[in-house]
């Protein structure tokens, strides 16, 4: 298939993982891959103005190009600040 690339789009929740394979034109962007996957219609909690995205665990912009075989990942927002959680655990273990 000249001019076409295959890309996976992933979105994971604690209880379920979504992994969609899409075929796009060469030069397609991260945003185009996400829209083609149908995940925005399937999961209304995904907001591309708020959710961060990446390609194989590396941060990416919606305007970045995707390549054949890439896995585009949509990240959920953090529920708690990791630094704060570490501080609380350290305090708790110090009080034992």
Curated annotation (Swiss-Prot):
It holds the Pfam family Ub-RnfH. Disruption phenotype: Deletion of the ratA-ratB operon has no effect on bacterial persistence on rich medium for this strain, but does affect bacterial persistence for E.coli strain CFT073. Disulfide bonds: none annotated. Gene3D superfamilies: RnfH-like. InterPro entries: Mopterin_synth/thiamin_S_b, RnfH, RnfH_sf. GO terms for cellular component: plasma membrane. Does not function as an antitoxin to the upstream RatA toxin. NCBIfam families: PRK01777.1 (NF002490). Belongs to the UPF0125 (RnfH) family. This is UPF0125 protein RatB. It comes from Escherichia coli (strain K12).
